[in-house]
Every structure is written in structure tokens, then in C-alpha cells.
Amino acid sequence: MSHARSAGTRTLFLLGAMVTAAILLWAYQWGLGTNRHGLSASFFVLFINDYPGAAFALLILMGALFGSPHLPARRVVHWAGHQPLAIATVALLLLALGAVVVYHNHPLAMDEYAANFQSRVFAAGELHGTFPAPQLDWLIPRGFQDYFLNVSRATGSVAETYWPGFALLLAPFMWAGVAWLCNPILSALTLLVIHRLALELFDDREAAGFALLLTMSSPVIFANGISYYSMPAHLLANSVFALLLVRPTPFRAVAAGAVGSLALTLHNPVPHTLFAAPWLVWVATRPGGVKLLTMLIAGYLPLCVLLGLGWFLFSGHLLHEGLAAAAQTASSDRLHSMLKIFSLPDTAVVLARLIGIAKTWVWAVPGLLILAAAGALLSRRDVLCRLFTASALLTLCGYFFVPVDQGHGWGYRYFHSAWMTLPLLATAALFRPTRTPREANSPARLFEDNETKDFVAACVILTLVFGIGFRAWQVQGFVARDLGQVPQYKGTEKRVVILDGRSSFYGADLVQNDPWLRGNEIRMYSHGAAADEKLMAQYYPELRRVYADRYGTVWSVK
């Protein structure tokens, strides 16, 4: 290890390589068997697919170790610190391209489709879509009803189950026909906010460049940034919330509350609640904290009432349209079911959370979590570092009490709302926060030397080029295979496609429709050949079966 003379570089390389190799072996070993260990199929499959990603991370560590003296990586980081807008613009263009070419402008999972569906409704100026009530079980698989999409079995009204903040953000893009551009824009804005947070912490442009590129180069930011998940919105909202409270004033507290209320209602309140709790305690306990906390609450209230309480009541009304007797107990029953989401973790949940931490590791720049842990420890005297550490730990620990794994998703979705803590704390291992200046004659900390910074910069640049490139190839293949699980019919006429999920992987997720069944294709989920034929004869007598394969049947007038 002749190129790694500094203790910081040796420590970062050896620890990074050992942990990455352990994750590689874990994923590889599980891939050899069929035991899912109580995990959902999608979560299990995506974890064993991280085996080659971990191998790639090892190669990047090796490349950075031997290549850092020869790469202009440090100059790139320095330039990025001075040109954040240029970096964010490049990121926006790459993410927009990825949303179309890599992600195929496709809501892959039901979490994505629910927000996509509701944004179409909002873009049309409505609160709910409408399906023919007798066909609901074909148009929305029964297990998805009132879980992802609320339905009225009396009227056929349909709206997303989650709170609608992200769907509202997506709606203008949907109206303009560029829904795929929403998350790339949110992700690019997040880069600018993280750069600004780093300047507040370190007052150093190179440090801000490290925080910026540690974020941009992590594949999880790319993958979520080209998707239809609400996670980029959570990350941006929480980052802005923190930025507003770095130097709290009454006006900034009101603004932080307003941003926080949007974060609470993006799709569910747990991500922001866990992130924001340490900040609220800190604001309340500082001098003048009562006034600041009052202003924060005032900022939270309007959108929480409108989107939070309002959507809760609207959803209850939709669910019980035409069922007057049940409506009296609807709200209390739904509130009780919402609270039941928290429970003590069992073995499967603990395992899922440990896998989540492993996924956070392999979907980031190699060594990022080591640096973040070191930064949290070494800079613990800085109040902002303590707050970011508390938010990260509370988010990480809080989800141990949510009794489901994340199913589909890139990286560890449940941590993404607090993900900005990692590059900021990692940078705190490389640079000292301005609030904790170096004491006279004190030795340099483990990772503060220039050689370690060169090594980290090389990891950043190699991951940006090769790590994201590899993950983009993986994601594109996964989404393309998913899209291929429909009948391979070439016609474009008006038709009904009935999907048979027996030969597909999460084929029910492909039953995606316009809120009013506009367009040339209606998708349904098969209830068996006899039931499908009976349905078609009753409601679409003019259509005949024109195509069939293992993925389903196609019905049209052709």
C-alpha cells in the first residue's frame, strides 16, 4: 500500500474494503438459496442484486487508492465548491435524461403509481378519479385497494391513500406533460441546499464542494432522482427546513414551519417527524425559544390542517360514500389503524433494517458512512453536527418500530429523508466546523490530511463516472424487464389488456390506468379465464380476444 502512507487513507481504505466485502459475501450467499428470511420478494431480490454493486464499490476503492495521485479529483472538488449552480445544472440534465432513458418514465412500484395517479387527478382540477364500480376489482387489484388507492365501492371514486403533498408538487409537471422532470428538478435543488448547508457549517468552499459531490456522486441520489418516489421531495424539504433553522429568527421559523408542513404531508408524516424532532427540541430550549417555537407551529398549521386533516377527512368520506351507517365510526377506525403502524420489531424487521444500513453503504460513495460516523464523533461539540447526528440516528432507529420492509426501492428508502446528514457529517471528518476551531498546537485529526482528502476526492469522481453508470445499467435493466411483463401485442387501437400475474414478478403493479380510463389502453388484473370472459361479455360486448400469451390477454374490436 505504497500510495497510502497516511493513517487516514489506510484506515478509510481498509475499513471500507472490509465492510464492503462483508456485504458482498452476505448478498452473494443469500443469492445462492431461496429462503427469503421473512422479507418481501422485491426487497429480497433487490438486496441480492446489490452483490455486483458491492463488487463495483471494492473496485472503486482500489482504483482510488492507486489512482488518487494521478487524478485531478481534488481540483474538480475545489471547482465544484465555487460553481454549485453549474454542478446542479449538469445534474439536472443527467437526471432528466435518466428519467426517460433509464427509468422509461415509468412508475415502477405502487408507491410511485399512487402519487402519479393522484397528480393526474389534480392536474385535471379534480380531487378523485372515477372507475366503473362493478369493475373495481379488475382495475385495481383487491390487495391494493384502501392500501395504495382508496376506493368507493358505491360510486367508483378513486384517490390515493397517502397524503397528497407530493402529488400536488407533481401536478404542474403532469399538466405540462413532463412529469418525469419533477424529481430531477427537486434533486438538483437539493444539491444547492446541501452546498449552502456546508457553507454554514464550514465557511469553506472546498468543504462545500466535498459535501456537494459526495451527494451528487452517490448512486442512490441518481436512482431516486429519476424515479417517481416521493423521497427526493422529502430530502429537499428536510434540507431546506434545516437550512432555515441554522440561524433561527421568527421569520425563518415561520418559513421552516411552512416547509415542514409540506414535508409532513408529502405522503406520510413519519419521515419529517423523525428528522425534525431534534431541531424542534433545540429551538424550544434556546434563548427566546418559546417565541421561535410558537412561530414554527404557526408555520406548520395551515398546510397541516388543509392537506393533513383535510385529506384525512376527504379520504374517509370517499371510502364510505353510500354507507351512512359506517361513516359514523370511519374516522376513529382509520385513526386507530394509522397508529397501529408502530409496533415492537420482530426478527424480520430487525433483519430488514440491518439490510437497509447495508444498502445505504453500497448505494453511496465508498467510505461515506465511515467518514460520517467519524465526523459525528469528532465534531460532536458543534451544535449543528449534533443536530444532524440526532436526526440521522432518530430516523434510523425510528423505523425499527415500523413493521414492514420497504419492498421496492433504491438504496434504503426509509433513511432517504435524512440522507443529507451523511455528506455533511462526512465533510466534518475532513474539515473542522467553524464553530469548533482548531486549538493551538493540537494535532490534525485522522482524516484531515491532504492525502486522505485526495483519496476521498478520487472515490467521489470514480463513483460519479463508474458507480452511477453501473447502477444506471442495473436500474434500466430492472425497469425494462418489468415493462416486458405485459402481453407482447403490437396493435395501438383502443383495447383492454387483462394481465395474468402468475408468470410475472409483481405483475399486479403494472395495472396502471388513467383516473377516468381515458386513452387507448385499459389495464385489468385477471380473475381467471372464465371470470374475465364473463366480465368482458357484460361490460365490453363489442370487444373480442385478439391476443394471448403467458402475461395475459388483449381484447379489442380488431
Each language-model region and where it sits:
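Membrane-interface alpha helices of multi-pass inner-membrane proteins
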Residues: 171, 197, 211-216, 239-244, ...
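Transmembrane-helix signature of polytopic, membrane-embedded enzymes
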Residues: 86-87, 192-219, 235-236, 249-255, ...
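Interfacial juxtamembrane loops and adjacent helix segments
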Residues: 124-166, 170, 324-338
